[in-house]
Amino acid sequence: RHNQTGVLFCSAPGRRSGRQTYSRYQTLELEKEFLFNPYLTRKRRIEVSHALGLTERQVKIWFQNRRMKWKKENNKDKLPGARDEEKVEEEGNEEEEKEEEEKEENKD
């Protein structure tokens, strides 16, 4: 069942509903808002929720999910395990430095 704004509404009172379905209009407006600013102030979240017929919580969670999607999309450029390779390289450099220090100490 849908409410007046086109949002799927099928939860019993006091129970969490399943996955939220947003209308095209709501999704477009949320995306536009996200492009303008990926973080909302409480005041702006209230304005957006009233304008779109959503709860503040729905808007807040939509933005959290959208930021995670954006973060994942931007991390695709990096190869999997790139951080691990950097860490191994740093550890290798530390070992080389220790060996050089030991050689210098042994010379004396």
From Swiss-Prot:
Keywords: Developmental protein, DNA-binding, Homeobox, Nucleus, Transcription, Transcription regulation. Residues 15-74 bind DNA. Residues 87-108 have a biased composition (Acidic residues). It comes from the Eukaryota. The lineage of its organism: Eukaryota, Metazoa, Chordata, Craniata, Vertebrata. Residues 73-86 have a biased composition (Basic and acidic residues). GO terms for cellular component: nucleus. Predominantly spinal cord and kidney. It comes from Rattus norvegicus (Rat). InterPro entries: Antp_homeobox_TF, HD, HD_metazoa, Homeobox_CS, Homeodomain-like_sf, HTH_motif. Sequence-specific transcription factor which is part of a developmental regulatory system that provides cells with specific positional identities on the anterior-posterior axis. This is Homeobox protein Hox-C8. Residues 73-108 are annotated as: Disordered. It is found in: Nucleus. Signal peptide: none annotated.
